[in-house]
Amino acid sequence: MRKRYMESGKVSALSRLGMRSKGLTAKVYVNLTMHNIVVTITAPNGDVLVKKTAGSCDFSSTQRSTKYAAQATGLAVGTRLKELMRTGGGAQVGGLVVYTKGIAKLRDAVIRGLASAGFRIEGIFDITPVPHNGCRPPKRRRT
């Protein structure tokens, strides 16, 4: 791999990943659980660039699973990536491919937050694990 150097002689983190001049597509992994939201942006080779949760965006326990928290988390991740691109020697991310796992009601809010940060969404994929009649579920709770 040929190294690209910045003016100061240092190699930027994004240029090492091959994203400086090409404007490649970054991958966004959104994990939506019942109690929290985790959004991770990775380079095409899998290196983590930015990671944020609803808890790190100052949402308390019950607020973390709301649509507002999902949109704010998506916006926070997008603005952090923009800041990384600006300080990383003019690196450009061409677009985002979103992989979601979990609750469907919060999915649109996270994508809306990423889009409002100014990124082009190139694809949305659902990777929620679905059992094909695997393990037997626990018996129902009696109250």
Model-flagged regions — what are they?
Residues 1-143:
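Ribosome-associated RNA-binding proteins
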